[in-house]
């Protein structure tokens, strides 16, 4: 706590020092201009120059310097709604610099709340939230949730966790720790400060389902020792912890079971089907489909998910709620759709079917409709066009920085991937 206070003090001193130096520099410049002005006046009296034109010539560079300084030191933020002290909440988002977390940050900031983002940048990126840095309602903390955090908040959105196969398979122990120890720490924080906690769980708790579509009362069909178990079982344990704290300690909890989500700020090479297909299509490479492509998925756009998370947090629903799009497509249909939207000549390449790849996944969202008044509203093609536009820009950015990412498959066994 002392070291954090010292850092804030040093930061404040540095800001004051910078302002002082800028002030001195401007005063020196004005003094120089004034000296030239006096000299020019003397020259004019001798009939050698017209002072009016020279004043304008000298003042214009000063105006330019002031404009440049304003651009450098005045950060323009997205529009933020004003909330009274009574209505404004102090909100913590773990994993807030990640794909979904950064969009949730945008939503809550623009709604007028005070938002603290905690991220260890294992998969999150500072770029995703840098447009809020410096805003009085925003704070970014580099912190791993497996370590305790001491902060006063009203709500906690616990999103911290690797969520794509390459990331959680690369470090399964870290994934387990984040979903168990990290969740335990956030529940402890919620208990201490009386905050409400929302756990970002997953449709993976249903495993390879034997019931279709999947409703919240389905217990699932999960392989507890498979290659994905670190994530699937980690989330199942996290849910158990939430309800244990609710029953024993009276902590208010909300649990969102999130289905496949896509949109801007996804990692380009995270191994998910959306990012893989878009990247392959944009680069003119074959779109890789594992198995026959008859497996089904239902994809929701990220803004729909964010609205669902906020609605759930502010509701009285303490039991798990599915958040997903019930519009179902086969993987093959999805590959063809992305190919057409990109306008790509890429072929579709069929590879061996992956281990533990669910054959069907579709959420039953009756509960979300009835109890939250929520359902997805962004059409699939509209969302995909936004994602494609983002990926085009990312490719340009990477090209300018001499790096072109390649689609990264999730390693399961013998180099195989699965559709996510």
UniProtKB/Swiss-Prot annotation:
It is a single-pass type II membrane protein. Residues 41-420 are lumenal. It is found in: Golgi apparatus, Golgi stack membrane. Pfam families: GDP_Man_Dehyd, UXS1_N. The modification Phosphothreonine is found at residue 94. Coiled coil: none annotated. The active site is at 231 (proton acceptor). Its EC number is 4.1.1.35. UDP-alpha-D-glucuronate binds at residues 149-150, 177, 185, 188, 191-192, 245, 248-249. The chain crosses the membrane at residues 20-40. Residues 1-19 are cytoplasmic. Keywords: Acetylation, Decarboxylase, Glycoprotein, Golgi apparatus, Lyase, Membrane, NAD, Phosphoprotein, Signal-anchor, Transmembrane, Transmembrane helix. PANTHER family: UDP-GLUCURONIC ACID DECARBOXYLASE 1 (PTHR43078:SF6), UDP-GLUCURONIC ACID DECARBOXYLASE-RELATED (PTHR43078). Belongs to the NAD(P)-dependent epimerase/dehydratase family. UDP-glucuronic acid decarboxylase subfamily. Catalyzes the NAD-dependent decarboxylation of UDP-glucuronic acid to UDP-xylose. Necessary for the biosynthesis of the core tetrasaccharide in glycosaminoglycan biosynthesis. This is UDP-glucuronic acid decarboxylase 1. The gene is UXS1.
């Amino acid at each position: 706590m002392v070291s954090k206070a010292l850092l804030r003090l040093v930061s404040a001193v540095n800001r004051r020092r910078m302002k002082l130096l800028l002030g001195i520099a401007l005063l020196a410049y004005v003094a120089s201009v004034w000296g030239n002005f006096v000299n020019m006046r003397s020259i004019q009296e001798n009939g050698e120059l017209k002072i009016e034109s020279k004043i304008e010539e000298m003042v214009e560079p000063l105006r330019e310097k002031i404009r440049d300084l304003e651009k450098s030191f005045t950060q323009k933020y997205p529009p933020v709604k004003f909330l009274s002290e009574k209505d404004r909440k102090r909100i913590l988002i773990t994993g807030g610099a990640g794909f979904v977390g950064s969009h949730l940050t945008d939503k809550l900031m623009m709604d007028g709340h005070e938002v603290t983002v905690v991220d260890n940048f294992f998969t999150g990126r500072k770029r995703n939230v840098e447009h809020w840095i410096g805003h009085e309602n925003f704070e970014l903390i580099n912190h791993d949730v497996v370590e305790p955090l001491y902060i006063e908040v009203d709500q906690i959105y616990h999103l911290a966790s690797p969520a794509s196969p390459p990331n959680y398979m690369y470090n399964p122990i870290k994934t387990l720790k984040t979903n168990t120890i990290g969740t335990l720490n956030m529940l402890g924080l919620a208990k201490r400060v009386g905050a409400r906690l929302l756990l970002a769980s997953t449709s993976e708790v249903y495993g390879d389902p034997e019931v279709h579509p999947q409703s919240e009362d389905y217990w699932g069909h999960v392989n507890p020792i498979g290659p994905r178990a670190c994530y699937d079982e980690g989330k199942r344990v996290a849910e158990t912890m939430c309800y244990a704290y609710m029953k024993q300690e009276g902590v208010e909890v909300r649990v969102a079971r999130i289905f496949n989500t896509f949109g801007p700020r996804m990692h380009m090479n995270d191994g998910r089907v959306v990012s893989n297909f878009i990247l392959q299509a944009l680069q003119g490479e074959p779109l890789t489909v594992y198995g026959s492509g008859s497996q089904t998925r239902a994809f929701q756009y990220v803004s729909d998910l964010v609205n669902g998370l906020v609605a759930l947090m502010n509701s009285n629903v303490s039991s798990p709620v599915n958040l997903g799009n019930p519009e179902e497509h086969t993987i093959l249909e999805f590959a063809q759709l992305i190919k057409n939207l990109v306008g790509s000549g890429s072929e579709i390449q069929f590879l061996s079917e992956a281990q533990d790849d669910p054959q069907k996944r579709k959420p039953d969202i009756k509960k979300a409709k009835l109890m939250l008044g929520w359902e997805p509203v962004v059409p699939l093609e509209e969302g995909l066009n936004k994602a494609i536009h983002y990926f085009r820009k990312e490719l340009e950015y990477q090209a300018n920085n001499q790096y072109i990412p390649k689609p990264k498959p999730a390693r399961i066994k013998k180099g195989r991937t699965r559709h996510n």
